[in-house]
Amino acid sequence: VPHRLPQDEFGRMVEAVNALLQALKEAKERERAFLAEASHELRTPLTVLLGHLDRLGRNPQDLEALRTARATAERMRRLVEDLLALARGEVERNLNLHIVDLGEVAREAALEHGVAAEAESGEVLGDPDRLLQLLRNLVANAVRAAGKEGVRVRVRREADHALLEVEDSGPGIPEDLLPRLFQRFARGPGGGTGLGLAIAHAIAKAHGGEIAVESRPGRTVFRVRLPLLEEEA
């Protein structure tokens, strides 16, 4: 909206509208990039899955093809779950609360991805499935950035909180991306759909916790703090 007005109330209003239009344009561009990436993320494993299923059709005893097909199907299932969780707003609602040892959850996620873990026990009140989803998203993001050997998962007790850290030795996150890293469709240098970190942020908030990131070339650390149960504090 072009204007040549003095800095009065109307002029400031026009500037605010322009800022809003720019924000909407950027959001639309992120959405288009996400749709393209999500289509690619689904199409690629589908091609792999169909290929291995074809191999199984010719040789039902091919266990390697079966393992790969199962792993690929699981990857697709998680992506679809992420999409549905955000679309329905389910991340913040309908938590199935239990006493959860965050250290156990961290070790499970680390084992799934083949990365190192140093996890103390720390009991929190939370949804075990959502907390595992949070861990999986952070660890998968780190593995994309640095490979399995460059990732460390840690859990320790810190005053009245459990502190979870996922560290990688990848190239780091561009400084201009950091302020919007946990927004939907914000994609880091490692690629991906831009959903994982937004979901991790929503899960942490839903559990009364917080998530933050510190990054420089060669070292990125995501930190999640969750309230410990009173008897653990």
What do these predicted ranges mean?
Residues R4-A19:
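HAMP signal relay modules and closely related sensory coiled-coil linkers
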